[in-house]
Amino acid sequence: MMPPPFMPPPGLPPPFPPMGLPPMSQRPPAIPPMPPGILPPMLPPMGAPPPLTQIPGMVPPMMPGMLMPAVPVTAATAPGADTASSAVAGTGPPRALWSEHVAPDGRIYYYNADDKQSVWEKPSVLKSKAELLLSQCPWKEYKSDTGKPYYYNNQSQESRWTRPKDLDDLEALVKQESAGKQQTQQLQTLQPQPPQPQPDPPPIPPGPIPVPMALLEPEPGRSEDCDVLEAAQPLEQGFLQREEGPSSSTGQHRQPQEEEEAKPEPERSGLSWSNREKAKQAFKELLRDKAVPSNASWEQAMKMVVTDPRYSALPKLSEKKQAFNAYKAQREKEEKEEARLRAKEAKQTLQHFLEQHERMTSTTRYRRAEQTFGDLEVWAVVPERERKEVYDDVLFFLAKKEKEQAKQLRRRNIQALKSILDGMSSVNFQTTWSQAQQYLMDNPSFAQDQQLQNMDKEDALICFEEHIRALEREEEEERERARLRERRQQRKNREAFQSFLDELHETGQLHSMSTWMELYPAVSTDVRFANMLGQPGSTPLDLFKFYVEELKARFHDEKKIIKDILKDRGFCVEVNTAFEDFAHVISFDKRAAALDAGNIKLTFNSLLEKAEARETEREKEEARRMRRREAAFRSMLRQAVPALELGTAWEEVRERFVCDSAFEQITLESERIRLFREFLQVLEQTECQHLHTKGRKHGRKGKKHHRKRSHSPSGSESDEEELPPPSLRPPKRRRRNPSESGSEPSSSLDSVESGGAALGGPGSPSSHLLLGSDHGLRKTKKPKKKTKKRRHKSTSPDSETDPEDKAGKESEDREQEQDREPRQAELPNRSPGFGIKKEKTGWDTSESELSEGELERRRRTLLQQLDDHQ
């Protein structure tokens, strides 16, 4: 089935008319009412050849009450089907089966006498080689809704508004062949030749071939009256002839042919044509040669061409009229095209004339132009309506032209003024506009240029501002370059001073422990130091500090290197090691060449401090071991059975303790004697205190005793079990006056310790209680010991964070805790009531009537408890 010619390619909207009707611009004129006695057109009888208006596959274009169909080709009439069938069969249909006809609207169609089908498109068997190439071209022409032609490629599915070059070449080839055929036909009309057999048509490409819209759409400019008259005459004649003929289909078909043959024909001059197409073309050429107008009637045309021999080219009158109608349609198109071209040429001439005339400007009025150019033929030949359109276009063109000229003049003036300002050396970035105007008036180039003097003041001021800004940018760039040069010189000065510090470090004058005051005499005499003075940024002192800090930052890494060197050499820093020996050992290693002298000294100080700390810790450990041995010796004396008495000599009891381990730990005999005498002194002080406190304030102690027993936590026990013996009670504590000197606590503590020694030594029960009661005083003395340790702290960087020092401090703290445990273990042995009352009053409230045996029993019980805790 042939595709509808009005279908656009993909991507464009189809130009479908509203409500299924053809477009208004393509609607054929309505048929006037039929005259009386004329019947409406009817279908021809079966079996007869179709008349002109009833070709199979076509709707009569002039049937009353109906409109011209947009697509008069059915599926059976598709040329692609014929082409495909012929291609499959292998043999194309002969040329004689196809005949060319002209529809009433002037369009050419083709009729197949074999299958009684009509098509709009020219069959492939009738096409020339150029036409076949044109049909195979992928580019096809279509029309949009507005009537503007566009071109579509079936293969690449591309649409464009411009005409492809391939399509132009093929159409030029087709026109060339058609022109050659026309010349051949003219020669044949003048010199008739015998008919020659037509060659077989070229092969037809498979597939449907789209028909361009221009071949199927009627000419919109054609007059309605001419179409009606041309279509009505053959219709009326055909219908009248059918009515008068016999009822049989054969008679109705043959009667018009006999009548046409019976009409008188002019004498033939003996000219002959090879086929009907050439004869029809010769008849049209006759009408064209005689200049038959498109509005001429048949009778007028006959008068003009009847005497020509070519008039007899078509034997039948119907064929002549059909060719005449086709010629009129074609001639009408040509006349309209010629008129359109003449009007277009006249408009172009007028437009060119107005655009080039010197009196025309963009502000000229139409009335003024009509008064000026009204007498000229170029003005009068164009209609007024089109003339106004041309005039508006000219005004638009002139306005655009004047605007462009103004822009060019403005650019020219600005460029000229810039050139003048650039050449004036008196203008700098501080020049004002009034000064610049005076300089310009004195400049000969500006004074001689009239266009430059008529320049817009605002444009001149803008140009001057841009010039001044350019000068300011140049000045700023020059200043920036000067600043960069100055900064570069300052940087070079700093680098030179840095290299000077490197030289001092290489010579050993500068190290991590150097100070600015030490090096200033050597630094100030150098020229590199003098170049640094007065410039911003880092000062020589800052660079010196940065350099020293950098050397100090290398301390930890260099310290590791020094330790590795000492480890490889097997050298250890002791308390009595000299720095010269330390430096002498390090100097033998190659790695010491890159070490800083100050860091070497700091490392030696750090190692020396660690050695001193180790020695101090060793001494403390030895003292702690000695104290533990003395405590064990005193405990051995306390636990002696029978107990030691006052007045006992060391030689008498020495043999009793020879086999004891505590005796063996004290290696010096003098120490043993000293500890034994201290023990006897403590024992003696305890006995004396017991004798002096028996008869002191008995009544008042009783009241306090009853009060204390009522508040005692262990109320079920007796007073005798809760309170310690009177001999173990400490003396009354005297309230200290704040105005007294700070040395009194230490003196009181010494007196207590001496008193404890008088009471029988540290091994006696009273001495332990005194130690327990004075626990708070001992705690107050511990911070003083810590302050003494802090005196040995060094200012070296690793003195605070050295892990060996931390380990030493931790071990010292652990030993202090171990030394504090025996003292704290004595506190729970005291009764709660005794401790609380002692803290509140400081007086002993036990009974004085206890016997000496009871006191001895309690003393032994306390000693036993102390031994158990130890």
Swiss-Prot record:
Q: What does this protein do?
A: May be involved in pre-mRNA splicing.
Judging by the UniProt lineage, the source's domain of life is Eukaryota
- Family of the protein in this entry: Belongs to the PRPF40 family.
**Which positions carry N6-acetyllysine?**
148
Q: Give the UniProt keywords, A-Z.
A: Acetylation, Coiled coil, Isopeptide bond, mRNA processing, mRNA splicing, Nucleus, Phosphoprotein, Repeat, Ubl conjugation
InterPro entries to which the protein is assigned, alphabetical:
FF_domain, FF_domain_sf, Prp40-like, WW_dom, WW_dom_sf
- List residues modified as Phosphoserine: 764, 831, 851
Listed GO CC annotations: nuclear speck
The identity of this protein, by name, is: Pre-mRNA-processing factor 40 homolog B
Q: Where is the FF domain?
A: 276-330, 340-397, 410-470, 490-550, 554-610, 625-682
Q: Name one GO biological process term.
A: mRNA cis splicing, via spliceosome
**Sequence segments annotated as region (Disordered):** 146-277, 690-870
Give the residues annotated as coiled coil.
604-640
Matching PANTHER family: PRE-MRNA-PROCESSING FACTOR 40 HOMOLOG B (PTHR11864:SF1), PRE-MRNA-PROCESSING PROTEIN PRP40 (PTHR11864)
Q: Where is this cross-link: Glycyl lysine isopeptide (Lys-Gly) (interchain with G-Cter in SUMO2)?
A: 175, 837
Provide ranges: composition bias, Basic and acidic residues.
Answer: 804-824
Cellular location(s): Nucleus speckle
Q: Where is the composition biased (Low complexity)?
A: 182-191, 739-756, 764-774
According to the UniProt entry, which residue ranges have a biased composition of type Basic residues? Answer: 691-711, 778-794
Q: Which gene encodes it?
A: Prpf40b
Q: What is the source species?
A: Mus musculus (Mouse)
Which PROSITE patterns does the entry link to? FF, WW_DOMAIN_1, WW_DOMAIN_2
